[in-house]
């Protein structure tokens, strides 16, 4: 079932999505809300972790981001992401790593520049939700990290960071966006 791009120059175009219950693309309502919160991503370097369909990176490019680094460990999904970027003539703005996002370090991404936006959507139905705070160190000054987490069972580290005022949590049905600003 195709996924529709919600904004920017490619608004209304479709991205392929696999017919499987293992992939849970970010809902269009959540994507629109996120980019409204960000209020512009022009020129951003984006890191899309646990990319799945790759829709978040594509949305960012459609809205003016300059480059996206995609990390997806499932071979079939990584191929689908590459196909989607090629179908939209975006492959020159893509660096794709077929790796487990949890075993990455910044050096392995050749990312000496850092990132302006980091988006992570771990498969939280299949695993314990990981502590993603170490990725905050990969942000450029003024950068934003956004992690999609289960609304019904927010991880303890998210609750602690929310109570401390370190992050902002926005709920959208079954998913919540955990937003950290560097």
Q: Across the structure, where does each feature detected by a protein language model lie?
A:
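Class I S-adenosyl-L-methionine-dependent methyltransferase catalytic core
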Residues: 1-182
